[in-house]
């Protein structure tokens, strides 16, 4: 998972496409996700996502986000990516995937690709609202676990995710340097 | 995707006609398949061939193994092209015959040809066979950690700021 920006599902076909990215019901109390409205990500959120990312990384990654958004919305069996809004403006997003497995059941593991929060709203609980709502939605789908990758030097992000009960998985991340390994 | 090779044995790209065979090769000993995953991968590769690199090994007129990688441009805050190994598989009866090494060698050559500079992968810590395979191919531990959260328990929440 990139610190600045964090995606989930792929698609069987339009007729089978399901969106479970709607917010939870009103019986969850005054939590972060209630103070920060969170909704399902849409195709026309692209410009807002790119703008937030540009403010974080200092450059335009429109092409990259266009692909990630298409992946989240068109290649996903279940749409679970979310956007946080305040006063009608997108102030954060989380891109995640969860696939359908055999017999139409969801795969047991969801993947978080990217999370991003507008730097002007970093103390508003936006990340918590997004992660909190995603976890509620994934539990509703009966997904068993959620996984992401984090740069091991990003201690702040790892500490942040630990607060949401994330812990090291049994997956080992590997790289092959294609330039050096000739 | 590339067209089927005409030779009875050798290396070639994958195409839609390989879908069922790839699903079968990937089937677990318990019989579980990743049909949806491969259907989507083949569909995406057909729609956006520039984003995928794939190779299959033919022997005796049949596909015996395959490898599938996706190209990422602009991810991880980098400008250079990175590849992610989506899937690699060899049919059980053809394992330990060098097909895996041949697949990876060819995949790497094809990735270099399109300018990829790094190949990312993941493996289960408890899978010594695959871990050894990757280590022998030159993979190193990545500067990334896979974090996971069980969804068996709900998030304990309270009102607080980030």
Give, region by region, the residue ranges found by the protein language model:
Chain B
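Short coil/turn motifs at secondary-structure junctions
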Residues: 72-74, 93, 126-128, 152-154
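Conserved N-terminal entry element of GNAT/NAT acetyltransferase domains
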Residues: 1-17, 154-162
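Conserved acetyl-CoA-binding loop-helix of GNAT-fold acetyltransferases
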Residues: 90, 96-109, 136
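Conserved beta-strand-loop-alpha-helix junction that forms the acyl-donor binding cleft
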Residues: 95, 121-130, 148
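Acetyl-CoA-dependent GNAT
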Residues: 13-17, 24-80, 86, 91, ...
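Conserved GNAT acetyl-CoA-binding A-motif
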Residues: 111-123
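Active-site/acyl-donor-binding loops of N-acyltransferases
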Residues: 137-156
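Conserved active-site alpha-helix within GNAT-family acetyltransferase domains
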Residues: 101, 113, 125-143
């Amino acid at each position: 998972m990139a610190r600045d920006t964090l995606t989930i599902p792929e698609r069987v076909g339009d007729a089978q496409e399901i969106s479970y990215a709607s917010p939870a019901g009103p019986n969850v109390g005054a939590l972060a996700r209630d103070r920060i409205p969170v909704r399902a990500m849409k195709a026309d959120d692209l410009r807002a996502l790119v703008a937030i990312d540009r403010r974080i990384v200092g450059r335009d990654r429109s092409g990259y986000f266009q692909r990630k958004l298409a992946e989240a919305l068109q290649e996903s069996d279940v749409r679970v990516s979310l956007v946080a809004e305040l006063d009608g403006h997108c102030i954060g997003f989380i891109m995640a995937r969860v696939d359908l497995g055999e017999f139409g059941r969801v795969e047991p593991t969801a993947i978080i690709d990217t999370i991003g929060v507008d730097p002007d709203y970093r103390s508003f609980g936006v990340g918590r609202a997004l992660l909190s709502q995603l976890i509620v939605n994934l539990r509703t789908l009966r997904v068993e676990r959620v996984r992401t990758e984090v740069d091991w030097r990003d201690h702040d992000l790892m500490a942040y995710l630990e607060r949401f009960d994330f812990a090291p998985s049994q997956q080992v991340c590997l790289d092959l340097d294609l330039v050096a390994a000739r | 995707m590339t067209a089927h090779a005409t030779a009875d044995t050798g290396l070639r790209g994958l195409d839609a006609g390989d879908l069922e065979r790839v699903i079968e090769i990937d089937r677990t000993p318990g019989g579980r398949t990743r049909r949806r995953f491969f259907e989507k991968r083949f569909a995406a590769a057909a729609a956006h061939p520039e984003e995928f690199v794939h190779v299959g090994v033919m022997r005796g007129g049949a596909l015996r193994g395959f490898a599938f990688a996706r190209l990422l441009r602009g991810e991880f805050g980098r400008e250079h092209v990175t590849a992610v190994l989506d899937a690699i598989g060899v049919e059980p009866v053809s394992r330990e015959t060098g097909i895996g090494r041949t697949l990876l060698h060819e995949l790497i050559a094809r990735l270099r040809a399109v300018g990829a500079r790094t190949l990312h992968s993941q493996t289960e810590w408890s899978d010594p066979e695959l871990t050894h395979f990757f280590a022998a191919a030159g993979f190193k531990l990545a500067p990334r950690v896979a974090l996971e959260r069980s969804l068996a328990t709900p998030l304990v929440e309270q009102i607080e700021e980030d």
